[in-house]
């Protein structure tokens, strides 16, 4: 088995050579994902829970943020095409202290040291997309930026001052800077246009929001992605992933129920969302008890 990836818009899982050939044709010739398919990468197929770890670094030390779990497939039960992400939860229950220590020793610090050795020191936010395989943690992807929609559940849990952390990354004092996260949880549910990630319509009026947010909702933030405002002031859809509804709570169950309750108050024509964000994480938590 193998994976065929374009420039971030989609991934095809291929079980044999014929599926791989068909996949390359769909991406590169049929332009299934548009211009993102001008180049593809063929990768080994790995299995295991996925973990997203955003981290701060000043080029010398790495301070990971709270872990998160993305939900890439478009539909429930992890079916359908891969997307940019249909929802996230934090923290990720599969990312135990033991796994975190192994990642720091074998992945995070070696990455920073290697970049320094190549004369390309990095300062800022470094995103590690990991898979916890039977052979240990493996790197699926790096990003030199915050992740979307991971950031929507990570930063709401940050208790330290973000500006001070960013400043310490630039001036090389991150080792002395506190990076503290709350003990709570966060969940984000993406509201997408029907047909995403392939063909979808734009310009659908969005209802339920006041000044872009849900009124009278505590611990809920609506993040805008594919939205626009018409000349007459109407908020409309303008992309595949339209809105992200994030809720925080003392436990994951609280955050998830609140996020879904809030999402129900928003509507637009052909709205699509997954109904099972976080269920895998809840099962993992239940197994630990």
Q: Residue locations for each model-derived region?
A:
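Short, small-residue-biased leader/transition segments that mark boundaries at the very start
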Residues: 2-4
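Short amphipathic alpha-helical segments
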Residues: 8-10, 187, 239-244
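Internal nucleotide-binding/catalytic subdomain
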Residues: 10-151
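Short, conserved charged micro-motifs
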Residues: 19-22, 197-200, 250-257
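Short hydrophobic/aromatic beta-strand micro-patches
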Residues: 56, 190-192, 246-248
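Short beta-strand/turn micro-motifs at beta-sheet edges
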Residues: 75-77, 176-178, 228-235
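Active-site "cap" helix and flanking loop/linker of ATP-utilizing ligase/carboxylase catalytic domains
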Residues: 102-126, 143-217, 230
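Generic C-terminus detector
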Residues: 227-232, 236-289
């Amino acid at each position: 088995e193998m994976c065929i990836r374009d420039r971030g818009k989609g991934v095809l899982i291929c079980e044999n050579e014929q599926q791989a050939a068909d996949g390359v044709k769909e991406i590169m010739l049929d332009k299934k994902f548009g211009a993102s398919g001008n180049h593809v990468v063929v990768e080994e197929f790995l299995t295991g829970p996925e973990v997203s770890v955003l981290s701060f670094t000043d080029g010398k030390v790495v301070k990971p943020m709270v872990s998160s779990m993305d939900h890439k497939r478009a539909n429930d039960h992890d079916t359908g095409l891969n997307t940019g992400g249909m929802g996230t939860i934090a923290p990720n229950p599969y990312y135990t202290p033991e796994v975190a220590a192994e990642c720091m020793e074998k992945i995070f610090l070696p990455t920073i040291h290697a970049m320094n050795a190549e004369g390309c020191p990095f300062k800022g936010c470094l995103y590690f997309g990991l898979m916890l395989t039977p052979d240990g943690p493996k790197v699926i992807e790096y990003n030199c930026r915050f992740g979307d929609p991971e950031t929507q559940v990570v930063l709401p849990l940050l208790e330290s001052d973000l500006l001070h952390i960013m400043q310490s990354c630039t001036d090389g004092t991150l080792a002395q800077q506190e990076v503290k996260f709350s003990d709570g949880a966060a969940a984000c549910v993406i509201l997408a246009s029907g047909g995403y990630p392939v063909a979808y319509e734009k310009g659908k009026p969005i209802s339920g929001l006041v000044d872009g947010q849900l009124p009278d909702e505590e611990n809920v933030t609506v993040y805008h992605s594919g939205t626009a405002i018409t000349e007459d002031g109407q908020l409309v859809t303008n992309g595949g992933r339209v809105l992200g509804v994030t809720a925080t709570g003392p436990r994951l169950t609280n955050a998830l129920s609140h996020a879904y309750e809030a999402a129900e108050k928003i509507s637009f024509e052909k709205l699509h969302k997954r109904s099972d964000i976080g269920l895998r994480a809840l099962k993992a938590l239940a197994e630990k008890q």
